[in-house]
Amino acid sequence: MNKYISDIAHYNEVLARVASVKHSLVIGTADIKDLYVKVGAGREPFLAVLDKLVRRGVEVRLLHAKEPGLNFREDFDKHPALIKKLQRKLCPRVHFKMMVFDCEVAYIGSANLTGAGIGMKSDGKRNFEAGILTDDLALVDAAADHFNAVWTGEYCKNCKRKDYCGMPITKQVKKDEIIEQNFQIIPLSVLMWQRGVLLLSHNKT
């Protein structure tokens, strides 16, 4: 399968796949805002979908360039499982938009993780977007390798944009380390997210 994805198909054929992921999901996006998915006659935040995944034991990694807006952060705080289990990093150089589903299918394209990009906004309000949905393993592996290179900080040492980076990926604290060090996790809506890690209080209990 190598399928051209445009406009509303980003919601119907890409975002709709997220709920059925069984093992792993990686998301790369430049911008990140609150977005919603249809549930019966209503809707729910996309974060609720991610919450269900991590509760099932699915590994979810989110890599983004910009700190999310207030609405996103407030929605995040309503899903405690995400605070503990969602893996998230921030790099201001990230401009790719991709999703890799269970290491088997990949979306590579232009749509950010926003309502107008990949969410349920209607025709006439949403962005014009374009991308490819593929199960060609050469492309899937290439996308995953590119994501992982950024995720692991492979480019940090020689990065020329350090003045714009509050905290290099190589120094971002893992959540299991936070728990072991007995730091206090501050709710994300209290202050802005701090460069790819949960805001921390260094007052140990």
Region annotations inferred by a language model:
Residues K89-R93, K125:
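Short solvent-exposed loop/turn micro-motifs enriched in small/polar/acidic residues
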Residues N71-L82:
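Short, aromatic/basic amphipathic alpha-helical patches
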Residues N2, K85-Q87:
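Short, conserved active-site loop motifs that form the nucleotide-linked donor/cofactor pocket
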Residues K97-V100, A130-I132:
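Short beta-strand scaffold segments in enzyme catalytic cores
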